[in-house]
Amino acid sequence: MIKKILAVSTLCLIIAPVQAADTYGYLAVWQNPQDENDVLQIKTTKEDSTQNESLAELEAFCKGQDTLAGIGEDQATGCRSVVPLKNTCVALAYPKAGGGVRTGNAVVITSPRFTSVHQIALNQCIKKYGAQGQCSLETVYCTSSAYYSGTVSSLIQHLK
């Protein structure tokens, strides 16, 4: 019994630092507010970022896109669709038959499981638009680079 208690206590001590290393990110969709037919710009922030780092990267992207499009600082930004993320993965799927990604046809799914988040997004897109929609993935992203190799591998990497 004491061995079991020690084993559980040791495991809790090992896992606690892993859970403390939160990672943040954003999935942003920028659409030119002056021309809704303009191509969408999709941005994910870099992996393994703190909350402040990912927010700074998002703000730089939005401001840069606005500047390129000639949008003044007193006007509304084109970054209207922003998904904040913490310790998770995200996938964006869309119906290719509809002519491309639009803010109205994007299917966005979040999940801590990289291995399945893309399939869930595709399945939801197909459910919504049918096989004739020819659903496709636009992006799959995780806030932590360790998530790409799976949950068990992530835990092992953090323990090293």
Q: Where on the chain are the PLM-derived regions?
A:
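Sec-dependent N-terminal signal peptides
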Residues: I2-A16
